[in-house]
Amino acid sequence: MASSSSKASDSSSQRPKRPDQGPSGKDAAGLVVLHGKLAQLKRQVQSTRLAAIKERVEANRKALQVHTCALFDVAAAAEVASRGAEGGNALSRGAAEGHCRLVGWDSASGPGERELVHVQEENLVAGTLVLSSSGGSGASHRTVVQLAKLPVVDKIPPYTTWIFLDKNQRMADDQLVCRRRIYYDPIVNEALICSESDDDVPEPEEEKHVFTEGEDQLIWKATQDHGLSREVLNVLCQFVDATPSEIEERSEVLFEKYEKQSQSSYETDFQLFLGKTMDVALDSFDNLFCRRCLVFDCRLHGCSQNLVFPSEKQPYGHGLDENKRPCGDQRYLRRREVYQDTCNDDRNACTTYNTDSRSSSLKVSATILSESEDSNRDEDNIKSTSIVETSRSKITNSEYADKSVTPPPGDASETENVSPDMPLRTLGRRKISKHASKSNDHSPDKRQKIYSSPFPFAMSVLNKQSVPEIGETCPDSIESAVDQLPSLDDPNKKISTKDMCAGSTTNTTENTLRDNNNNLFISNKEHSISHWSALERDLYLKGIEIFGKNSCLIARNLLSGLKTCMEVASYMYNNGAAMAKRPLSGKSILGDFAEAEQGYMEQDLVARTRICRRKGRARKLKYTWKSAGHPTVRKRIGDGKQWYTQYNPCGCQQMCGKDCACVENGTCCEKYCGCSKSCKNRFRGCHCAKSQCRSRQCPCFAASRECDPDVCRNCWVSCGDGSLGEPLARGDGYQCGNMKLLLKQQQRILLGKSDVAGWGAFIKNPVNRNDYLGEYTGELISHREADKRGKIYDRANSSFLFDLNEQYVLDAYRKGDKLKFANHSSNPNCYAKVMLVAGDHRVGIYAKDRIEASEELFYDYRYGPDQAPAWARRPEGSKKDEASVSHHRAHKVAR
């Protein structure tokens, strides 16, 4: 066995040969050898199995012996305790000493002479019972028994076991309900109801062979040594009770099983997980997560939904107070604060220095506004200008470059482990000059000439468009930067702090530093990207999309345990080549990743530009109640004469056309669609003032919809103290009254015996007119399935089906809430209404009049003339029911 297993493991990397891949013919001697090997292996498997069975039987025998001994000890102790107890057996004593003797006779008479005849005389008025008996001697005995009168209790009505649902659920595809269900007719004869068609009954499948562990060993041994030819399959059929096709399928399963086990064991699941992209890692989550209910494994919309990506993304929130506080020692804001304190102390000494050489002097005038609260360094509205004057050229054109936060320079090791003493550079916007001479037009690269500072501290980590602000440069930092400067043309040549503050450097030094900066920039970029896995890069891009360039929030929420805030900031401003408006020359290094990040950043900049523009001036929109949706659709729904249409999100981009799924179905586009907010088919909510959302003036209420806080302007929900950025609660305590179903603000419903029929629903607290009572929940089934179930429910004299829309019917027979017990009445105190809540149709129960506490709830089921049960029909002479809508089955219909 050991040799065979080792040989099997060695050959596990080779796939077994297929019948057409094997040799053309097998030698008879080879088949004989294979037959002998399989027979020997079978005997070994049988002997091993026999030994295992004997061992298990012995273990079970010992365990049973211990268990029986324990039970015997318990029984013996109980017997001893019963013998020593006083009074004997209480049951025997109670039987011997009865409360009354029903029959009496002479105990002295012999047993053969007793012939008892019982006579009962009932006196219901007195509540007594006289029992008389006569023996063989002719003596009679009478015994009077006092009867106890029990109170009359009504029979408990039939009750159906049901499962509580707080929201609707869709019926499973493979669910079988009301098939072959037994019911009892009035003659109490058992009958059987099958489905409408016998084709629905699945045919019994053939039993498949279940392979044992020993059979797997035989198949694996034969396929690894001799392949999977037809001769080998025929030989295996002699040892395994299965067909050749089943053996072939089993060999494929065994190959996949052993192939996975033969993979490298040193790679952990975490390492394999990091090697994947985010799309591959979240593939199962995309199928299980519902983007409408924001839950996994949604019972309402199901799994494997069509992914609809919105064309307009929500702007990320910013301006939180907590972003000002450093999240830890690895937060780059803490390094920046330490660096700014150091610069403030040394800046006074730098300003007292006089520059005498005007031919090469640099006059710097910088005006820096306060930084934004979200620590977003390249999108703050910071205006910083630098006027550079030189004796050789004159500035003729300028443009602004983005502001960036740059970590300290260093080699590859310093990029990963940043010293706490090394501050980050804060660079402002500045003007860069462009030569207007002819020689520049004939330059090889034909680009703008950028006046870069010869400071290796900043230039070693910035791209060609990032120039440090000279006014922010401190002598100490420059001195340390010069010490860390790599070797130039002249290794003994040093640049003094005085010359660097004055800006008196030669062109040779500038060119050398510029070339050195480019080399360091490319090397640092290559190193940093190589240390970021594919999953980490995807998470970083997703963080840019959600939080902007806020390294703290990205590291805390998406890269927790993987990267620190400092590493995210370093990666953002070292390798974020897409943040520059112009492409870099080293595009081949970043590849598609730079293009993807550039797409994120461009979209982010456009969104932030719109936000900043809105802050400057309030935009007044032309909005009327007619623009909220389609008046024809709203009128049709309000009249209740046609079916409601099931909503399915469309995947249109930007504007919807004639091919839009929502337009074809006659529904409005909702917030779950992929089209933009400016789509003409989009429902834009309401702009109602206070206390107007419960009137027909509200577009949402008129269209039988509930207000949506994400769509309606003045209908928003506040829960909390505002610490998470949500809007504070209004001072007057106003809240939109058309969001009861969305917020589940239902009343307390009680369940009790009804005076009308069966069980009923009762209100606990008094309610006013049009108040929301609760939701009628249940299973979402098709109309065809509802017809099948309705036949059973009609025989049981119950109705739990509720027409929802043209695609689904609510069935609350097995799953629902307590409002399913509300009975029908021709004069109801409640009414049912179908409302569209977040794209889903839901049934709400509302008070028709004022209802007092503990009062039973009734609403009109809207039965057809011949569909209502006997207890729900109107008295003769009433013709109001004739106007009701006729249905094929007893269904509840909302108005």
UniProtKB/Swiss-Prot annotation:
GO molecular function: chromatin binding; histone H3K27 trimethyltransferase activity
Ranges for domain SET: 747-862
Regions of compositional bias (Basic residues) in chain numbering: 886-895
Predominant place of localization: nucleus
Transmembrane segments: none
GO biological process: heterochromatin formation; methylation
Region described as Disordered: spans on this chain: 1-28, 369-425, 485-508, 867-895
InterPro entries the UniProt entry points to: CXC_dom, EZH1/2-like, Hist-Lys_N-MeTrfase_plant, Pre-SET_CXC, SANT/Myb, SET_dom, SET_dom_sf, Tesmin/TSO1-like_CXC
Basic and acidic residues compositional bias, start-end: 873-885
Protein location: Nucleus
Biased composition (Polar residues): 383-399
Tissue expression summary: Expressed in roots, leaves, shoots, rachis, anthers and embryos.
Family matches, as SUPFAM superfamilies: SET domain (SSF82199)
Enzyme Commission number, as recorded: 2.1.1.356
Official protein name in the record: Histone-lysine N-methyltransferase EZ1
Organism expressing this protein natively: Oryza sativa subsp. indica (Rice)
Source taxonomy: Eukaryota, Viridiplantae, Streptophyta, Embryophyta, Tracheophyta
